Swiss-Prot record:
The gene is kdpD. In the central section; belongs to the universal stress protein A family. The chain crosses the membrane at residues 397-417, 429-449, 477-497, 511-531. It is found in: Cell membrane. It comes from Mycobacterium tuberculosis (strain ATCC 25618 / H37Rv). This is Sensor protein KdpD. It is an enzyme of class 2 (transferase). PANTHER family: SENSOR PROTEIN KDPD. It catalyses: ATP + protein L-histidine = ADP + protein N-phospho-L-histidine. Residues 1-396, 450-476, 532-860 are cytoplasmic.
Length: 860
């Protein structure tokens, strides 16, 4: 017995795999969307149902509202209907969707009309779309209908147009999550004609409907809303396709408007102007703020917050990018977003001002690359500092030029005009002021050069004897030396103050960026979304999260976004290491400065935390699955030991009785003991057969040969096998089985079908010992339905699906009633043959098991 038990445990090795991997594939949701009642949504749904029925799909109708329309009711003919469930409320009975009946029937496709319907109080779920979610979770495809006025996000707009508040609403995300949304469109004039002909409402309601809700203006507005809403969904699908296929070329499939803001007083005007431009072409509006990487041109958080609130209220999205050259950063972002129009602010500038600084707008227009640029003027923009808009390279060159030009200009003015009015002290003060100006512009080094040049010019042109490098008076020498020393000292102080100001602004901007990225994580963004935000902010071609495990020669790509991403550290333009070098954030694009790397190091740490958090969640899920598998394995071992112990004990008692010499058994007693032994062996044989079949199913080695199988022959062979005791020991119950399958033929594997029927009939005989078991069959379109019906105790409602789980038997509350693999094996065999099997209540009591198999293409 020990060896047999070990062998059986070995047989169940594949069960761990099966338990961990058995999942139910979620059904698909298809929605017919309409602008108003009567456009033909239900009619289109029924037409799709007939097309699927012609292809051999198992389609049933659970809820179809015909509203008294004859054409719709006629189209419902030929479709199996699941009766509604009636709910009593305030003395009346209301029909509702019977979710449990749908789950018991378990068709491939079910029709559920009016997805936004509110269920009668007392129902399990308050809304019908929640019922549909349960059906989808069971792996059943649902086809439904929705009117645009029922979308919760558009409810107030529809009420404003029609003057009618819609009580029944459905969240927008439910409809957006549908696998397919098809618009059923009809012109307002055609819909009004249909209404006038009585094809929508009864005759007594037509006049009121035409003069109220179904006015031409209302229908036109609702139609436009429906078309625009669906266009948004198509656009989202297109963006997903472009991202999946890594397409970067601009597709002007839709207008997109980008507006650049600084956070200053002109920003709100720019956003409103861009919103008007976008609304005229129904374009998407994006607001972008460029953060200067050098820390200049900072803006306060409250100012930028007001711009963000305005953008959100206008339906725009807010974006932040980093770049030292603002026009380049704007154009890169616009191209990345596939924008067609760019709105920038500009100020009125004099000719002299344009000579030194063209302005961001003018520089942006020079290289738009196919993007239409709108330059909007605003009085407040003229007060902005032009120096802060200069790039670091331009500012560096300008400061060194100022170090040469400012002392020269001061010297020329002093020699030509001021020398006659001022002494050496006043002239030194002028040069001192010039050095301070250079220090403010460029820092210590240009200021030192300016101080040196100032001293030389002061000595040569303004100190006696003039036009020589000789200093005759000691006071003049001291004055020049003090000038140089004080100029350099003050330049150091000024440069330090300016540096601290820039650092403070840079720190504020870094904090703003960190808050931006941290906010994405807190809002539940996944790793790919975070990397996309990094790529967008720093104008990178691609961003990759790489993991280099200890001892590995190559890295593992955890996630990547963009085109042509880096796959190793050496090929990256910018590489950010995290912690112990296990994670790297790799960037392909422009090389980032050290100041940007500080922020990215913190972001990369957040990204690594997301990876580890995801891994911990997966490990927790695996641990839970293993725990469930261990629990099921313990249940299996307990059940197997019970099923083995009972027949072995009976056989042992019978053999011991026959071998005893103390009692002389009559021939009848001997025959009975031998029958007990045979019956026990039959039970063991059936148990081992089911175990082996389950093991084969778990290993995926079942390869059915589908041919024409005559059900009369299959049922008779199953009854013979039961009578011989191959799968059970209720030989005396064979006469209780009534067969009425006629000449039905199914496409099946004859051997597997015999095993399925034998298991189901044997199960019915076991649990309905005093009742008739009926087996009947019939063809329904392109399917053959086989019913095994008993009138026994049945099972509690809602637990029918549990019968097909491994180790489950009717009425099980513990693991002491047996293995219960027969029904599980039956489902595995049926599904291997491309069919389905389900259980439902027998009217009057009992259990009915329905096998659904394909029918041959030609009728015999």
């Amino acid at each position: 017995m020990t060896l047999l038990f070990a062998d059986l445990c070995a047989i169940f090795t594949p069960y761990r795999w099966m338990i961990e991997h058995v999942t139910t594939k979620r059904g698909q949701l298809r929605i017919y969307l309409g602008a108003a009642p009567g456009v033909g949504k239900t009619y289109a749904m029924l037409g799709e149902a007939h097309r699927r029925l012609e292809r051999g799909t198992d389609v049933v109708a659970a809820v179809v509202e015909t509203h008294g329309r004859n054409k719709t009711a006629k189209l419902l003919e030929g479709i199996e209907m699941i009766p509604p469930r009636y709910v009593e409320y305030r003395g009346a009975r209301f029909p509702e969707l019977d979710v449990e009946a749908v789950l018991r029937r378990h068709p491939q496709v079910v029709l559920v009309d009016e997805l936004a319907h509110t269920n009668t109080p007392g129902s399990k779920n308050p809304k019908r779309w929640q019922d549909v979610q349960e059906i989808l979770d069971a792996g059943i495809t649902v086809i439904s209908t929705v009117n645009i006025q029922h979308l919760e996000g558009l409810n107030d707009v529809v009420e404003q147009i029609t003057g009618i508040e819609q009580k029944e609403k459905i969240p927008d995300e439910i409809v957006r999550a549908a696998d397919q949304v098809e618009l059923v469109d009809i012109t307002p004039e055609a819909l009004r004609r249909r209404l006038a002909h009585g094809n929508v409402y009864a005759a007594e309601r037509v006049d009121a409907a035409l003069s109220n809700y179904f006015r031409t203006g209302n229908l036109t507005a609702l139609r436009e809303i429906a078309l625009l809403w669906l266009a948004d969904q198509v656009d989202a699908a297109l963006e997903k396709y472009r991202a999946d296929k890594k397409i970067t070329a601009t597709w002007e499939a839709r207008e997109r408007v980008v507006v650049a803001v600084t956070g200053g007083p002109e920003s709100e005007t720019l956003v409103r102007r861009a919103s008007r431009i976008a609304s005229k072409s129904s374009a998407e509006l994006m607001v972008v703020h460029v953060i200067r990487g050098d820390g200049l041109a900072g803006v306060s958080a409250p100012q930028l917050g007001r711009v963000r609130e305005l953008a959100t209220s206008l339906g725009a999205t807010m974006h932040t990018v980093v770049g030292d050259d603002v026009p380049t950063a704007l154009l890169d972002f616009a191209r990345e977003m596939n924008a067609t129009q760019l709105v920038v602010g500009t100020s009125r500038r004099s000719r002299w001002a344009r000579l030194f600084d063209e302005g961001i707008g003018a520089r942006t227009v020079q290289e738009p690359g196919g993007i239409d640029v709108h330059m909007v003027t605003h009085p407040a923009a003229s007060r902005a500092s032009g120096w802060s808009r200069v790039s670091p390279r331009e500012r560096h060159i300008a400061s060194w030029l100022a170090a040469l030009v400012v002392p020269s200009v001061i010297c020329a003015i002093t020699v030509a005009w001021l020398d006659r009015f001022m002494g050496i002290g006043g002239e030194s003060a002028l040069f001192f002021i010039g050095v301070l100006i250079v220090a403010l512009l460029g820092g210590v080094a240009p200021a030192a050069l300016s101080a040196l040049l100032s001293g030389m010019l002061l000595n040569y042109f303004l100190t006696e004897p003039r036009y020589t490098w000789t200093i005759a008076e000691p006071d003049a020498a001291v004055t020049e030396f003090v000038l140089l020393a004080m100029a350099v000292a003050v330049a150091v102080l000024v440069d330090g103050a300016a540096s601290r100001t820039r650092e403070a602004r840079r720190a504020s901007q870094e904090a703003e960026l960190l808050a931006l990225f941290a906010g994405s994580v807190l809002r539940g963004a996944d790793l790919a979304t975070l990397l996309q935000r990094v790529r967008e902010t720093y104008s990178q071609r691609a961003v990759t999260m790489l993991r280099v495990r200890q001892g590995a020669s190559t890295g593992e790509t955890v996630a990547c976004v963009g085109t042509n991403p880096c796959r190793d550290v050496d090929s990256a333009d910018t590489a950010i290491e995290v912690g112990d070098d296990e994670f790297w954030m790799l960037m392909a694009g422009r090389k980032l400065a050290a100041r940007d790397r500080r922020v990215l190091t913190a972001v990369a740490t957040q990204a690594a935390g997301l990876v580890k958090q995801r891994e911990l969640a997966e490990e927790a899920g695996q641990a839970e699955a293993i725990a469930r598998a261990d629990e099921l394995r313990r249940s299996l071992l307990s059940a197997v030991s019970h099923d083995l112990r009972t027949p072995l004990a009976a056989a042992k008692v019978a053999v011991s009785s026959l071998r005893t010499e103390d009692v002389a058994f009559s021939p009848e007693d001997t025959a009975e003991l031998l029958a007990t032994i045979e019956e026990s062996i039959d039970q063991l044989t059936a148990l081992v057969a089911n175990l082996l079949d389950s093991s084969r199913l778990a290993a995926g080695v079942i390869r059915p040969q589908l041919r024409r199988a005559y059900l009369e022959e299959a049922v008779q062979r199953a009854l013979v096998s039961i009578g011989k005791g191959a799968t059970g020991f209720y030989r005396s119950g064979i006469d209780r089985v009534k067969v009425d399958v006629g000449d039905a033929v199914a496409m099946a594997d004859a051997g597997l079908l015999e095993r399925v029927l034998a298991n189901l009939i044997d199960n019915a005989l076991r649990y309905a010992p005093d009742c008739v078991v009926r087996v009947n069959a019939g063809r329904v379109r392109e399917r053959v339905l086989i019913n095994v019906i008993d009138e026994g105790p049945g099972v509690p409602r809602g637990t029918e699906e549990q019968l097909f789980a491994p180790f489950q038997r009717p009425g099980d509350h513990d693991n002491t009633t047996g293995v219960g693999l027969g029904m599980s094996v039956a489902r595995g065999f049926v599904e291997a043959m491309g069919g389905t099997i389900s259980a439902t209540d027998t009217p009057g009591g009992g259990l009915t098991v329905v096998i659904d198999l394909a029918a041959p293409e030609d009728r015999p």
